Amino acid sequence: MVHFTAEEKSTILSVWGKVNVEEAGGEALGRLLVVYPWTQRFFDNFGNLSSPSAIMGNPKVKAHGKKVLTSFGEAVKNMDNLKGAFAKLSELHCDKLHVDPENFKLLGNAMVIILATHFGKEFTPDVQAAWQKLVSGVATALAHKYH
């Protein structure tokens, strides 16, 4: 279980309140699919994923990215119980979708990069550390069903 200090929680909540979920979600998922092309196999029904520009402009990537980041809001609300908050998603990704749990870490890292680009100098090393801790905790929670 991940333990967050009051300061880390405050930092995460402060940034999350300013996140454009639709924009950042599409960018994070798009970046995952471009940087780690083998992840595209989980999205074969998304249509054209043939190039970085096709991926980043794909409406299905944007829509699913928004869905992913919206569910990530549950992590922000449930920092003290990530495993419980993601139990159903863990089961779905393990039992039905058969997603390699390493991909959760990759998506989390892509999300941190997107937050850094969106918030610039405001995304200090302390802010990044809090967010890395959260995305790592979410990745672990999503991988829970695999163990």
Curated annotation (Swiss-Prot):
Tissues in which the protein is found: Red blood cells.
Domain spans labelled Globin: 3-147
Sites where the protein binds heme b: H64, H93
Annotated Pfam families: Globin
Entry-linked Gene3D superfamilies: Globins (1.10.490.10)
Keyword Ribosomal protein: no
GO molecular function: haptoglobin binding; heme binding; hemoglobin alpha binding; metal ion binding; organic acid binding; oxygen binding; oxygen carrier activity; peroxidase activity
Subunit structure: Heterotetramer of two alpha chains and two epsilon chains in early embryonic hemoglobin Gower-2; two zeta chains and two epsilon chains in early embryonic hemoglobin Gower-1.
PANTHER family in the cross-refs: HEMOGLOBIN FAMILY MEMBER (PTHR11442), HEMOGLOBIN SUBUNIT EPSILON (PTHR11442:SF7)
Protein name from the UniProt record: Hemoglobin subunit epsilon
Organism: Propithecus verreauxi
